[in-house]
Amino acid sequence: MDSAVSKLGFIPDGQLPKLINQDAVTLELKKCRDSIRKRIRTYNFKEPKLTDDEITKLAAKICGASEERKSYRKILAILLLIDRPSRITHFVDEGVSDQDLPLEIVETLSTRPLRRRSFDLRRRGDPLAKPLRCFMCPRKWRKSTVERFEKYQWSLLAPFLSQDGPRLFRFKIPDKAILPFERWERIGQQGGFSHVYEAEIHPDHHGFHVQDLDAQDGRGDHGHETTTNPPSTRSNVFAVKRLKTQNRDDFLHEFDMHKRVSKNLHQHLIPLLAAYEQHGIYHLIFPLAGADLEKYWRNKEQETNQEAARWVAEQCQGLAGAVAAIHRSYTLSDSLSFRALPGGQSEGETQGVNMSQTNGPPTSIPRQRFAGHCRHGDIKPKNILWFPDGSRQQKETTPRGTLRITDFGAAQYAEHRVPTSGSQNTPIYRPPEADLTAQGTEPDVIVGTSYDIWSLGCVFLEFVAWFLDGWHGVQIFLENRSTVDRACHNFHTGKFFLIESGDAGKTSRARVKPEVDQVRSRPPQPSSLRYLRD
């Protein structure tokens, strides 16, 4: 099977028992026996001749059907790939089985003068580092043959990616491992901190079930309840986010943020399926969305009927509940895997707080300092994904889908009474507090969880503009409020507020741009749609 990310292919786990079965192994062993005479005459070594009964027993042993319950299927497959199937008997005799793979390369110094460094293959973690006899029978293998064995063993060791219920797995994949990706295509525009790929993972090599979150019992208005495990739909196509950073702390920060919010996953939050590291590059695996919200607005023609208005209102309510769920997440100062906001100083203490651990039962954590609630930090249309088949409970012919918040790369924890700065929020959707704090005119202005509320409100206004006038309405709304932004090197941005300088001795103040108020002051729509405008 070809791999989309490696020149060398892989053999899917489910195919191996079909290819290496007792009948096929018996036939191959008999072929090897018949060719032994030629090798004896050529190399002048003794090779034991196997009877038919011995071959049958050996085939059962190779396929794991003997009392040992060891399998040598992968070993035989590797030997077939390098055209050395008759050597399987030496591996079986020494007990070098599939569970010993991958064998490690160990460099050795030749005792002969003027000879280059050599190497052999040995079991992983062997404290005595014993050379394996199977690579010396009937004579020492050539270096090129050993290299081929080491190379092709990875074709049988494609990793299995999975999750275990609410637990998230983080995999450290060997650099030589062949990922079981049958398709790997970049999607969307290049982001500032990551690339996103559409990856088709072979069904034998993942255990992900993309849940229909609308069917979960624990959806709730604000995501208070823990979701159950509902019937799920299986897909082999996922979104893989490849981080540009090679800083492990940045990767662990985003992973841990997802792990924290996944404990009570809200219907309108994207679930992280797993994460992995290979070649020092970090990846996060998610369900594949149909589009981000901006692309949805651009390509989807709006409908101004009551059902469409209800859907927009429901999605806005759901997104607000998802943001509230994020804000209810918190951490303690001793949780080193969480990154505190710059300058954040915790106040107060938490005694005996029960924190449900991802990989174990709840534990009591005595007297740890409260490090703060979480805020997303970068809510914008591009960080809201549209899933076309996510609203199965809607009683309509064509489900309109579900919106879910994604990208926790900028999410941070900060005690909500502590001033913070240095946000990575997209300039257009930043709140006035960010500019007032940055200018130093209001050093006591709080930039906390309200940061997200402002950003989400901006998205809602654009959502209404799209609902009323389509993508053209979104663009006109942006053009009307676009002004020179001193905080962004005097570029024009479409932020939603103005900073008015105060008179002598007075502080600056922020106010909403008039163009924003114009959206609310538009003439009323049909009576069935008025509630959406409000």
Stretch-by-stretch model annotation:
Residues K300-G318, L341-E347:
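Activation segment of protein kinase catalytic domains, centered on the conserved DFG
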Residues N229-T233, D256-Q267:
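Structural motif at the C-terminus of the N-lobe alphaC helix and the adjacent alphaC-beta4 loop
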Residues F238, K263-A275:
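Conserved HxN/HPN-centered segment at the entrance to the catalytic loop
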Residues H279-D292:
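Conserved short submotifs of the Hanks-type protein kinase catalytic core
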Residues A434-P526:
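Conserved C-lobe activation region of Hanks-type protein kinase-like domains
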Residues F370-G372, G377-Y429, D435-T437:
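Activation segment/activation loop of eukaryotic-type protein kinase catalytic domains
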Residues H327-T398:
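Catalytic-loop of the protein kinase fold
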Residues M1-T233, K244-N247:
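Non-catalytic localization/regulatory regions flanking kinase domains
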